[in-house]
From Swiss-Prot:
Domain text: A long coiled coil structure formed by 3 polypeptide chains connects the central nodule to the C-terminal domains (distal nodules). The long C-terminal ends of the alpha chains fold back, contributing a fourth strand to the coiled coil structure.
Signal peptide: 1-25
UniProt superkingdom: Eukaryota
Gene Ontology MF term list: extracellular matrix structural constituent; metal ion binding; protein-macromolecule adaptor activity; signaling receptor binding
Protein name in the entry: Fibrinogen gamma chain
PTM notes: Conversion of fibrinogen to fibrin is triggered by thrombin, which cleaves fibrinopeptides A and B from alpha and beta chains, and thus exposes the N-terminal polymerization sites responsible for the formation of the soft clot. The soft clot is converted into the hard clot by factor XIIIA which catalyzes the epsilon-(gamma-glutamyl)lysine cross-linking between gamma chains (stronger) and between alpha chains (weaker) of different monomers.
UniProt KW Coiled coil keyword: yes
Keyword tRNA-binding: no
Length: 438
């Protein structure tokens, strides 16, 4: 296609404008200023323009003719180009035959093969997963079978009495002393049945070489049992009995009542204490009794026999008030728990001190108190109440000192005194030198 030079196009446009604008103007000498033959140099009027056109008309016409021919060629070339472009467009709409078209079937086959290979890979992966799941299932089935066997064994054990799983001696009696009288010589777990009891129950019997036997009613030694219990729990008992006497428990107020009131022969209660320096001390009380539930398990004893721990059950003068000793004595007090308040205090001693006990206002002895490691504790340690709530025996150690271990046990009075034990009538004064600071 021939291109029209840029100068030709510009000339064509200029001549076209001049031809259309001045083609009908006829020169008139009346309005022309003939000063110079050069166009418009001194007199640029229409007269000069007409003269210029007349002079160059022939050349302009020749150039115009040339340009018209050139435009015709351009037009023809443009038409041809348009036809070619339309043909190419139409050709592009149809699938082109190329080398790619020839290999399309192979590509499709390869793609199909690849898809089949992928499917096979997935299939084998599924097979592996299925095998793994089958192994897991089989393993779980074995575990379930073993667990069912264990459950069956446990169910068989639970159907048998507790004595089949612990070492319980065959002797029995109304208390541990009667068990020893029947020939028992080893300390351990025994069943006893007090005279008024409806059924026998398990106790720990501490049997001495002389044949005298203590029935243990309370044990503290490591803080493993929480003694913050309600009325029913203290009535029935809680904690754990063990053949080696290495567990904490409260035998139960109802059992203690049946034991201590079954005979005309009174019982002696012994309190055994151990501090955190491993020093030990005792306090013995004659004619210990625990009333019935109707009397809220009232605690009574006849007198303090002796013991270097001192008579904390008789109260103690802490120096806080002239009435301290009177309001901290325990003889004759009823049992109190946080849900059954029987103390002499306007508040609830059992609730603020976190235990069940024979509270007055409140205590000088508190053997069911909170277990504090190391012994010494403070008001901040005792919680919101700020009261002395540890395992306390105020006549031996200060009120802010909690014992390491405690045992409460009873024995018939007629067996008390064997092998050098303190005898009735030989009571000692309390040793007040070891009270500690209050």
């Amino acid at each position: 296609m021939t291109r029209l030079p840029k100068q030709g196009l510009l000339l064509l446009q200029s001549l076209a404008l001049l031809s259309s604008a001045f083609g009908n103007i006829i020169p008139n000498t009346d309005n022309c200023c003939i000063l110079d033959g050069r166009f418009g140099e001194y007199c640029p009027t229409t007269c000069g323009i007409s003269d210029f056109l007349n002079r160059y008309q022939e050349n302009v016409d020749t150039d115009l003719q040339y340009l018209e021919n050139l435009l015709t060629q351009i037009s023809n070339s443009t038409s041809g180009t348009t036809i070619i472009v339309e043909h190419l467009i139409d050709s592009g709409k149809k699938p082109a035959t190329s080398p790619q078209t020839a290999i399309d079937p192979m590509t499709q086959k390869s793609k199909t093969c690849w898809m089949k290979l992928t499917d096979m890979k997935n299939y084998y992966q599924y097979e592996e997963n299925i095998l793994y799941l089958q192994e897991v299932y089989s393993s779980n089935q074995n575990k379930i079978f073993l667990l069912k066997q264990k459950i069956a064994n446990l169910e068989l054990q639970c159907q048998q009495p507790c004595r089949d799983t612990v070492q319980i001696q065959e002797f029995t009696g109304k208390d541990c002393q009667e068990v020893a009288n029947k020939g028992a010589r080893l300390s351990g777990l025994y069943y006893i049945k007090p005279l008024k009891a409806k059924q026998q129950f398990l106790v720990y019997c501490e049997i001495e070489p002389s044949g005298s036997a203590w029935t243990v009613i309370q044990r503290r030694l490591d803080g493993s049992v929480n003694f913050h219990k309600n009325w029913v729990q203290y009535r029935e008992g809680f904690g754990y009995l063990s053949p080696n006497d290495k567990t904490e428990f409260w035998l139960g107020n109802e059992k203690i009542h049946l034991l201590s009131t079954q005979s005309t022969i009174p019982y002696v209660m012994r309190i055994e204490l151990e501090d955190w320096s491993n020093q030990k001390s005792t306090a013995d009380y004659s004619t210990f009794r625990l009333g019935s539930e109707k009397d809220n398990y009232r605690f009574t004893y006849a007198y303090f026999i002796g013991g270097d721990a001192g008579d904390a059950f008789d109260g103690f003068d802490f120096g806080d008030d002239p009435s301290d000793k009177f309001y901290t004595s325990h003889n004759g007090m009823q049992f109190s728990t946080f849900d059954k308040d029987n103390d002499k205090f306007d508040g609830n001693c059992a609730e603020q001190d976190g235990s069940g006990w024979w509270m007055n206002r409140c205590h000088a002895a508190h053997l069911n108190g909170k277990y504090y490691q190391g012994g010494t504790y403070s008001e901040a340690d005792s919680g919101p109440s700020g009261y002395d709530n540890g395992i306390i025996w105020a006549t031996w150690r200060r009120r802010w000192y909690s014992m390491k271990s405690v045992t409460m046990k009873i024995m018939p009075l007629n067996r008390y005194g064997a092998e050098g034990q303190q005898t009735l009538g030989g009571s000692k004064k309390s040793d007040f030198e070891n009270r500690g600071d209050f």
